[in-house]
Amino acid sequence: MATIKDVARLAGVSVATVSRVINDSPKASEASRLAVTSAMESLSYHPNANARALAQQATETLGLVVGDVSDPFFGAMVKAVEQVAYHTGNFLLIGNGYHNEQKERQAIEQLIRHRCAALVVHAKMIPDADLASLMKQIPGMVLINRILPGLEHRCVALDDRYGAWLATRHLIQQGHTRIGYICSNHTISDAEDRLRGYYDALAESHIPANDRLVTFGEPDESGGEQAMTELLGRGRNFTAVACYNDSMAAGAMGVLNDNGVGVPGEVSLIGFDDVLVSRYVRPRLTTIRYPIVTMATQAAELALALAGKCPTPEVTHVFSPTLVRRHSVSTPTDTGHLSTTD
């Protein structure tokens, strides 16, 4: 891999001159710019975005990396961070990581190139060591929905395992023992922790786990449809299903309705997140509230404080989810008809 010294040698200039060209300094002559640019292209040299940005004066811009801004969950996150930016006189720049390591890196580097001194980052695919390196370079970078060992005080996260345990326990408390689970097929900690929470609740109540009652899909409505279709295809040996998120629950509910399976009379359904769709499906969805607005607000305020070198307490910011009772859960009945709803 080419270095800045290789570029200087090929261009016939000093390393300092290469640095001035990279940082767009007015002290760099046009001849130097041409020579350095040509050398960089010949060597396929890409200057470190972090080093360039840190060498320049930061702007009043708050950066945010999300999984996918079209997802209602991330839409709520964006709105919360935008409010913090507005009230503190900052602009907001947004990058999408799409749950892909390379795209997450590109989104972060793009925001750094725009000299965002404060960053709120939702990145699930970049390895811990690489994220830790980035956070050491960028004092105002805060992670949301992830805990990084050694940097816990710069992370804002949810106890996902507890949330899934809470959802499954609620179904058990209503009398269900044959409980399915629809899980995200993304290899991220959220999916792993929520699946563990489901199994925890079953084990705590001495209910044998049945892997045939667990299906996986994309964490959206179509993924929920596919997963519920698969569950039904295995035989309807369940009276309740917990879902990875509300979008999957909405898709699953649609499949149940299409197949003439009543919710909650024949199958109870519980989601996770408490996004907008949970209040507009019919029946309205019982779910687990993810306090994303509060969490995103705290993450943005923390990032700005760190970027401004303000003293902040070195505490772990882990939030606990809560149960939201609506109308998609009831007690199971032998006849499959509605008994009581919450």
Curated annotation (Swiss-Prot):
SS bond list: none
GO biological process: galactose metabolic process; regulation of DNA-templated transcription
InterPro entries: HTH_LacI, LacI/GalR-like_sensor, Lambda_DNA-bd_dom_sf, Peripla_BP_I
Molecular function per GO: DNA-binding transcription factor activity; transcription cis-regulatory region binding
Ranges where the HTH lacI-type domain occurs: 1-56
Residue range(s) of DNA binding per entry: 4-23
Highest rank taxon of the organism: Bacteria
Pathway the protein acts in: Carbohydrate metabolism; galactose metabolism [regulation]
Keywords: Carbohydrate metabolism, DNA-binding, Galactose metabolism, Repressor, Transcription, Transcription regulation
Pfam families: LacI (PF00356), Peripla_BP_3 (PF13377)
Stored Gene3D superfamilies: 3.40.50.2300, lambda repressor-like DNA-binding domains
Function description: Repressor of the galactose operon. Binds galactose as an inducer.
Subunit relationships: Homodimer.
Protein name (record): HTH-type transcriptional regulator GalR
Organism: Salmonella typhimurium (strain LT2 / SGSC1412 / ATCC 700720)
